[in-house]
Regions:
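P-loop/Walker A NTP-binding region and its immediately flanking N-terminal helices
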Residues: 1-173, 177-183
Length: 185
């Protein structure tokens, strides 16, 4: 797996806390630690418990917990096998059609040989997906359709109107509102 995207590698040995950026050091590691947006985390918990996780679209202003929430969900789903089940990409860096046709399709087209009942699908996390080109989003839609049995996608963006309707319609959408002052303190 390419080591791209945000966040710590949940399945790896912990790094020295002095070397971690502040945002990584204090990022919630579990859904219980995500204190804001309880309605979203409780819905995600129900999806996990029912083994029925859909494609997800998280949108809202920066700093509202979108990335932290999906990383905590992935940690709950996969634990130590996180790295073999999750592909994290920052779409503002990898925004073109070649990434969709190359990295994402290659990851989506393979299955894990030793998967259990609870982790039969992989997860692709596309952060800042509103930076993807229209052509890349159209290619992503086709990959989502073709590999939906094997992979779930979490599309994260600040501006949902920059995500093509064909992708929006294939995802369960969650709006992350700005945090209250007492939630930040």
């Amino acid at each position: 797996m390419a080591d791209k995207g945000k966040g710590r590698d949940v399945g790896d040995a912990p790094r020295s806390s002095d070397a971690l950026p502040w945002v990584e050091k204090y990022r919630p590691a579990t859904l219980d630690e995500v204190l804001s947006h309880q309605h979203i985390t409780s819905t995600l918990e129900r999806f996990i418990d029912a083994h029925q996780l859909p494609h997800l679209l998280f949108y809202g202003p920066p700093g509202t917990g979108k990335t932290s929430t999906i990383m905590a969900l992935a940690a709950r789903l996969y634990g130590k096998s996180y790295r073999s089940h999750v592909l994290e990409l920052n779409a503002s860096d990898d925004r073109g059609i070649d990434v969709v046709r190359g990295q994402i399709k290659a990851f989506a087209s393979t299955r894990n040989m030793f998967s259990t009942q609870t982790d039969t699908f992989k997860l692709v996390i596309l952060d800042e997906a509103d930076a993807m080109t229209q052509a890349a989003q159209a290619a992503l839609r086709r990959v989502m359709e073709q590999y939906t049995r094997n992979v779930r996608f979490c599309i994260i963006c600040n501006y949902v109107n920059k995500i093509i309707p064909a992708i929006q319609s294939r995802c369960t959408r969650f709006r992350f509102s700005p945090l209250d002052a007492e939630q930040v303190a």
